[in-house]
């Protein structure tokens, strides 16, 4: 099983459509395996799309890269310049798609399936408690006050304690990206973090920030390819 949905192959359900029930046998237009992560083999949780087009749980792709120490796709082994970006189209569809729990038969919204199987007695009796992959939170040092904290907390920390800072600093998160060198910012590090590193979500997604980040990465990659091509000619 594996989630092979890409941005080209998926179509969002109409907003006015009645939520559809997906049986385990699948739908010819939208096979149920499209919502399964090929790493944990469960319904996707916080789906992330890699550069090669495959979709995984956020924690699964992060843990796979961390444990293997290789920036490659767990499914096709293609090189990955980053962990990917939120598969917002998949996340939207999962909020309107329903499936019967394979163990107890309860009709559950796909976006809530992971929470359901954590408490599903029949699932627990058969497989044991759902085991999430290990904590993948990395640590970093605030470039302004040198305080060590979780990467996920850096943006909130800077907003609370360093909103007015304009000293040129290096972005500590760029160190962890294989295709990025440390960047110095004379302007707002907060804005850089929002655009370049705020890529995951909990209860909601800021689609404007995500779209801006994607556009910026595409433009940066296009410029880099143009420069490399110019240097070789």
UniProtKB/Swiss-Prot annotation:
ZnF (C2HC RNF-type) residues: 101-120
PTM info: Autoubiquitinated, leading to its subsequent proteasomal degradation.
Region (Interaction with the C2HC RNF-type zinc finger): 43-45
Membrane topology designation: Lipid-anchor
Region (Linker region): 121-129
InterPro entries, per the entry: Di19_Zn-bd, RNF_E3_ubiq-protein_ligase, ZF_C2HC_RNF, Znf-RING_euk, Znf_RING, Znf_RING/FYVE/PHD, Znf_RING_CS
Protein name: E3 ubiquitin-protein ligase RNF125
Pathway: Protein modification; protein ubiquitination
Coiled-coil zones: none
């Amino acid at each position: 099983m594996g989630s092979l949905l890409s941005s080209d192959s998926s179509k969002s359900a109409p907003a006015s459509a009645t939520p559809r029930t997906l049986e385990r046998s699948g739908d010819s237009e939208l096979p149920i395996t499209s919502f399964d992560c090929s790493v944990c083999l469960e319904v996707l949780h916080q789906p992330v799309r890699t550069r090669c087009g495959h979709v995984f749980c956020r924690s699964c792709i992060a843990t796979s890269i961390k444990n293997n120490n290789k920036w490659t796709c767990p499914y096709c082994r293609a090189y990955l310049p980053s962990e990917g970006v939120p598969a917002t189209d998949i996340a939207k569809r999962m909020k309107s798609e329903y499936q019967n729990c394979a163990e107890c038969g309860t009709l559950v919204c796909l976006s809530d399936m992971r929470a359901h199987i954590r408490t599903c007695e029949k699932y627990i009796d058969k497989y044991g408690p759902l085991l999430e992959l290990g904590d993948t939170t990395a640590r970093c040092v605030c470039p302004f006050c040198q305080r060590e904290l979780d990467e996920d907390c850096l943006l909130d920390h800077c907003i609370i304690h360093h909103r007015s800072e304009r000293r040129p600093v290096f972005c500590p998160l760029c160190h962890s990206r294989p295709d990025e060198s440390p960047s110095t910012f004379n302007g707002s590090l907060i804005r850089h973090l929002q655009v370049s590193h705020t890529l995951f979500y909990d209860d909601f997604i800021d689609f404007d920030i995500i779209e801006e980040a994607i556009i910026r990465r595409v433009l940066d990659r296009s410029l880099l390819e143009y420069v490399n091509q110019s240097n070789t000619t």
